[in-house]
Amino acid sequence: MNYMIIYEIIAGILIVVAILIHFNIMKNKVAAIKSQTIYESNRLKEEAKKEAQSQKKEAILEAKEEVHKLRNDLERESRDRRMEIQRLEKRVLQREELLDKKNDVLEKRESSLDKKQQEIDKVQAKVEELYQKQREELERLSGLSSEEAKDILLEEVNKEIKHESAMMIKEVETKAKEEADKRAREIITSAIQRCAADHVAETTVHVVTLPNDEMKGRIIGREGRNIRTLETLTGVDLIIDDTPEAVILSGFDPIRREVARIALEKLIIDGRIHPARIEEMVEKAEKELENDIKEEGEQATFETGVHGLHIELIKLLGRLKYRTSYGQNVLKHSVEVAYLAGLMASEIGIDPTIAKRAGLLHDIGKAVDHEVEGPHAVIGAEIAKKYRESPVVVNAIGAHHGDLEFQSLEDVLVQAADAISAARPGARRETLEAYIKRLEKLEKIANTCEGVEKSYAIQAGRELRIMVKPEDIDDAGALEMARNIVKKIEEELEYPGQIKVNVIRETRAIEYAK
């Protein structure tokens, strides 16, 4: 037990001794590290000091070199400036010497000029004195003052100038007229040669061929019902005579004539000919004709190269195919006028597009002149304005018969083209136009009466057939209307023979069995 304690004490002493030895070793190491650190620090300080001194010396040397360089540059610049100043001073001195010399020369010249001016003044005074003496002598000899002589001379000169001016103006005007007439003939001749139209006058009848003569009886119908219905609905005379396999449609209005032709041809093909079927076919023919009218208008614009027209203007153009002026087809005439106006516009150097447009539309008023009062040129101008045509086109339409004043070259071209087309041999017939005008006036008298639904002048104007509205006109009123219309015709129209006025009042009651 005691040994154990002793061993433990010895072990504790050894541990303490070991700790002390270790502490002493560590202390020595720390002291060594510290001394090493101090040494290194001192060494670095010495090296830094040496480096700083070295850099300081280098900086001082560089500064000295820079100062030396700057001093040399300043000295060189100063030397150059001194030399430049010396050169400038020398030039200034030279200029001063030159100016002094010039000044001396100018003074001498001025002195010389003064002397010459004095001499000139003396000579001028002598000339003035001589002139005055001569004028007084002339006045004494002529008995006129200088002002009077001057006025006489100016008057003579003025007369001579006026005479020469008048002669020159007359010569220029004569030459200009000759050139203008020659150029106008060339333009018109060129336009006519380049526009060779083959259309001639229209007539007022149309022949419909029949498959056989038996068809004539079917067209007439029992007691003439079919032919009366067709004539009443279309306003066209059906002439059935001994001509084999043919029926003649006679009427002054080409639209009615065309409706009757289409309806009759459809009835012949269909074979069923009775009043109800006739009404149906006439209605179909009217619709078909409306489409044809639109197509004709579009074809006319395509042929002439006029684009962008309002659809209503195109329809009115198509209606012109079924209008005649002195027997001349108005649509063909309008296309011809458009070509001529465009060609002449190209010849004189203006835009042919506007001239062609105005030429094509110039007779558009004839498409509605049966329904609207006034000259067709003014009506056409109002229609074109309504559908937003340009002011140039509108005025050209209105001015082509002198109803409006000319405002542009296009107005004159359209009038000239219209006259050329109308004057072409075979284009128009005066007697046919007078006949159509009489029939139109006959229908117009009937249409002015209240309650008239539609009216037709048939039998070459020997009969006026009037359809009235049954709800507005009774039987007694129909008789009174017939008498009034007869009276108006006798007062307003001149006509051969007599005219039959036929007022028709028809009432229909329709019901459907279901």
UniProtKB/Swiss-Prot annotation:
Endoribonuclease that initiates mRNA decay. GO terms for molecular function: RNA binding; RNA endonuclease activity. GO terms for cellular component: plasma membrane. The chain crosses the membrane at residues 3-23. It is found in: Cell membrane. One of its GO terms (biological process) is mRNA catabolic process. Keywords: Cell membrane, Endonuclease, Hydrolase, Membrane, Nuclease, RNA-binding, Transmembrane, Transmembrane helix. It comes from Clostridium kluyveri (strain ATCC 8527 / DSM 555 / NBRC 12016 / NCIMB 10680 / K1). SMART domains: HDc (SM00471), KH (SM00322). This is Ribonuclease Y. It is a single-pass membrane protein. Gene3D superfamilies: Hypothetical protein af1432, K Homology domain, type 1. SUPFAM superfamilies: Eukaryotic type KH-domain (KH-domain type I), HD-domain/PDEase-like. Residues 330-423 form the HD domain. CDD domains: HDc (cd00077), KH-I_RNaseY (cd22431). The gene is rny. It is an enzyme of class 3 (hydrolase). Residues 204-289 form the KH domain. Its main location: membrane. Belongs to the RNase Y family. It comes from the Bacteria. Its EC number is 3.1.-.-.
